[in-house]
Amino acid sequence: MVKHVKENVDPISDEFYKLAEENENRWHLNERQLELLEGAKNKAKESGLWNFFLPNAETGEGLSNLDYAYIAAELGKNPLASETLNCSAPDTGNMEVLERVGTPEQKEKWLKPLLNGEIRSCYGMTEPAVASSDAKNISTSAELVGNEWVINGEKYYISGAGDSRCKIMICMVKTNPDAEPFRQQSQILIPLDTPGLEIVQPMTVFGQDEAPKGHMHIRMTNVKVPKENVLWGEGKGFEISQVRLGPGRIHHCMRSIGQAEKALDLLINRGLSRKAFGKNIINLGKNMETISRSRIEIEAMRLMVLKAAKAMDVLGNKEARVWISMVKAMVPEKACKIIDDAIQIHGATGVSQWSPLPGMYVKQRILRLADGPDEVHHHVVARAEVNSYELSNVRKVASNEK
């Protein structure tokens, strides 16, 4: 896999992204970009480097979450690498959902082309009018009329929906507002070309629209899809989101470690190659200490993520949720700090178009909001810790000893 990235992905990356800047239609990959991307994907397939993220040996490589952790950390060093192995978000989470709970018909129509890397997909959770980190707040409605779901509502920051290759959205909707709070939601498959579905605009991130994938604002007005498009049955939306978001969160953190590694390499390279006041700038101020702290933080993050991955393998996603929240609250924040330190040692170049660091920083900063903001994950961890204390007589006695 490392050889594939070095020989087939790194050499095409600069040309791929430069071509994107020249596109007349920024939401479509041009022929040369597709040629470069498909060439790298075909080489990955030929080498058996495909769908590593799926633990099912029939549809993926049969790797554990712990196995995949090492791979994803390497993929994180080049943003294009994951797509060449068909391991890109949000497709990975959507494929895992379809693989686990999709009907044979849903798998044939949507999972099969996703597994083959023929189409892309998106996931519709976040809404502009409510605090969407609490899934109970989701207000987009789906009413069953005859044999069709009629869907109304808005979603925004729907990652990847701007890409012309994106054909299907898994959408979180409210199907029964009178049910118990965690049984009100369902998830429904909505083709993006369905009448009534409108891509209103790309939402910007730090002023950038991130074409060609983007984060789109979507409005649905009387969108109709067949009754059979519901996933796993009505009222299962919250359970599906946990199936999907658990692995997704840890995959993001795995890739973040790769980004932190790359930032540290860039920091050291800059420090050794530039002089000021008669010295290499690596030897000025606290730069050596910064390098030390960065390496320590990277190794701490790596061990935490590996522990969370092992917990998922042994305990299951639900029982490992506290460990997943630990790494999700920890890793993007620390990766941001390491990238920020790398920017600082680069000076003005660190925030310019001549450096990959600005884009790296933006992606890590987004992760502190995506798939649950830091505060939600800290709350999950703290709640578990308080509950553990209250159930432990040993801890209570020890804390009261003088």
Named regions from a protein language model:
Residues A129-S133, S159-S164, P177-A179, V205-G214:
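Short Gly/Pro-enriched turn/cap motifs at secondary-structure boundaries
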Residues M1-S82, S88, V101-Q106, P113-E118, ...:
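Alpha-helical interface subdomain recognition
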Residues S139-S141:
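Short, surface-exposed charged micro-motifs
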Residues G117-T126, I170:
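A short, Trp-centered hydrophobic/proline-enriched beta-strand micro-motif
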Residues M95-V101, Y123-G124, D178:
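Flexible, glycine-rich active-site loops centered on histidine and acidic residues
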Residues E148, N152-V200:
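A short core secondary-structure module
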Residues S88-M95:
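Short, conserved phosphate-binding/catalytic loop or strand-edge motifs used
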Residues N137, P195-K224:
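Flexible, small-/acidic-enriched active-site or ligand-binding loops
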